[in-house]
């Protein structure tokens, strides 16, 4: 696996792979990689001949008071994990390479609708930053396919809308959430948890499971289900941010006759904000 830092080197390497008739797969990341990221690379390697990953901690998607400066940088360990997962090329630019004219006058990409509410309400400007950097990376790499985790479900919906609306010839693949044995969704931010917090963190997923189980048993009072689950979260030590039941296909608020649902939540455990979601497929009427 080669590591390149400039757009010029990246394009030369991708052009060489294209000249050899290879399909290009792409996995964008911010580094501090775990088994969830590795699964994305493995899926890309199964679907494409040449896998490009990127590591770039994107300042545009961090709001005021968020954890940009303390976000872990673990390049050597990340390189080992990427290589083992089947990555062929790592693009590791700095901010000057990504935003050569600075970020103040940078063209921004906004995806209305799916980027609003949920994490979009809690983190103003976050999805604009995500959409902008992903658009730039897609133009830099020009992949045939790209893999994103379902763990960041709203982000995946934003990327799907972006690619569709801007007519990008890129297949977007959603990868299942990877979890620890106790159910906690793998996340780089889990490293911020104390031992005591880590022990109670799986309660976030259990609150989603309780809603899913009730839905499968015919419950349709969404407001009551949400209230009960948020009480569970508080009793476990969380401060809930949001918990909502949405249509899994378009992220609109769920209607009573919707069959494809997703339950999404964000909550703080101490100073660490965790997110999770659970897809719920209901049998037809």
From Swiss-Prot:
Homodimer. The active site is at residue 37. This is Pantothenate synthetase. ATP binds at residues 30-37, 149-152, 186-189. Keywords: ATP-binding, Cytoplasm, Ligase, Nucleotide-binding, Pantothenate biosynthesis. The reaction proceeds by a bi uni uni bi ping pong mechanism. Its main location: cytoplasm. NCBIfam families: panC.
